[in-house]
A protein has these predicted regions:
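Local beta-strand N-terminus motif with an aromatic residue
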Residues: 48, 153, 198, 220-221, ...
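Glycine-rich beta-strand-centered segment in the early N-terminal region that forms part
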Residues: 2-4, 17-66, 71, 79, ...
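Cysteine-cluster motifs in flexible loop/terminal segments that predominantly coordinate metals
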Residues: 55-116
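Mid-domain Rossmann-like dinucleotide-binding core that forms the NAD(H)/NADP(H) cofactor-binding site
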Residues: 50, 109-110, 116-118, 122-210
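Redox-cofactor binding/interface segments in oxidoreductases and associated redox assembly factors
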Residues: 2, 53, 158, 225-226, ...
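C-terminal hydrophobic helical "lid"/dimerization subdomain
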Residues: 206-207, 237-241, 282-335
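Glycine-rich cofactor phosphate-binding loops and adjacent beta1-alpha1 units
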Residues: 148-151, 187-274
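Cytochrome P450 core scaffold surrounding the K-helix E-X-X-R motif
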Residues: 9-14
Length: 335
């Protein structure tokens, strides 16, 4: 491994919001590195290849992969279990199996990964930046471009400006939205959003929704993307009330497995509003990771500015403490 982003999803496992698989488990799911060895049955891969790891594997054969929805590949059923697709394990301590987070465990200096989770990238790319597209950037960008289907002239609200929300801002801006509205109570996150494409920022969702109505003749936003740190019922309800008729709420944030969504049924039917889930921003890793990195190389997607602090692996707990304190847009472990 060369680098790994500190994503909130790993923290969700420690809090129980996401059920962990086999414990103990080596975490990390947003990483990039250089191939040091290849096993059998891996044509097309060589020692020295530079790769971004995808926390969602793609078999290329199932219904979802064949339909262009690689993020829903059937192999993803093992993402939270910690084991390989054949039920075996690639890590152990004193003979005891160790689970691999998302099958890739990027919080390790070395890891064993199935080729289904590897995306080969340009060796000239800085891997400490490229690692971010493996989750946070791809998830946020795709939430705006793919799930919300942002278009020129639209009004898009992004609720929660962290490692995912900031990239939804970039995606909505790149798609040509006229009003890109970022919502976060932390001032430095609002300032960062303004520098990366947000046209307006607000500390509260109420203020953002009021502004959206003021610039759309009272209709509301075309889409509201929920990228809060921990999803709560009220987040979806607030987003739902902020969108226009036939508008879309994109739910990207992760909450407790028992968290429920409650919205007015009347508006759902008579206003034809839509609630759309988004896993990895409805992106297909093998297609969209290289594309996003090409955008980075051409200056249309900014990655360097996302990294607030870099850490050594031994300082991972400090990195997550900084995340909880609202100090980081994205922390990155550099090996």
């Amino acid at each position: 491994m060369v680098a790994s982003g500190l994503c909130h999803s790993d923290d969700h496992m420690t809090t129980g919001d996401l059920p962990p698989g086999l414990l103990p488990m080596a975490g990390g799911h947003e990483g990039a590195g250089i191939v040091s060895a290849v096993g059998p049955h891996t044509p097309g891969w060589e020692v020295g290849d530079h790769v971004v790891l995808s926390f969602l594997p793609g078999c290329g054969r199932c219904r979802w992969c064949a339909s262009g929805m690689q993020n829903l590949c059937d192999l993803g059923a093992n993402v939270l279990t910690g084991c390989r697709t054949d039920g075996s394990f690639r890590m152990s301590i004193d003979g005891q199996p160790i689970g691999q987070g998302a099958g890739i465990s990027t919080f390790c200096e070395d890891t064993v990964v199935d080729v289904a989770s590897c995306v080969k990238v340009d060796p000239d790319l800085p891997l400490d930046k490229a690692c971010l597209v493996g989750c946070g950037v791809g998830t946020g960008w795709g939430s705006a471009v793919n799930a919300a289907e942002a278009r020129p002239g639209q009004t898009i609200i992004i609720m929660g400006i962290g490692g995912i929300g900031i990239n939804a801002v970039q995606g909505a801006s790149h798609a040509g939205a006229t009003h890109v509205i970022a919502v976060d109570p932390v001032e430095f996150k609002r300032e960062t959003a303004s520098s990366l494409g947000a046209t307006h920022t607000f500390a509260t969702m109420d203020d953002a929704a009021e502004f959206a109505r003021s610039v759309t003749n009272g209709q509301g936003a075309d889409a509201a993307i929920v990228t809060t740190g921990v999803l709560k019922t009220e987040h979806v309800a607030q987003a739902f009330s902020a969108i226009r008729k036939a508008g879309t709420v994109v739910v990207t944030a992760v909450g407790n497995v028992e968290e429920e969504v409650r919205v007015p049924a009347f508006e759902l039917t008579f206003f034809q509003k839509r609630i759309q889930g988004a896993l990895f921003g409805a992106s297909s890793p093998s297609r969209d990771i290289p594309w996003m990195l090409q955008l980075y190389q051409s200056g249309q997607l900014r990655l360097d500015e996302l990294i607030t602090t870099t850490y050594k692996l031994d300082d991972i707990n400090q990195g997550y403490a900084d995340m909880h304190a609202g100090k980081n847009m994205r922390g990155v472990i550099v090996y």
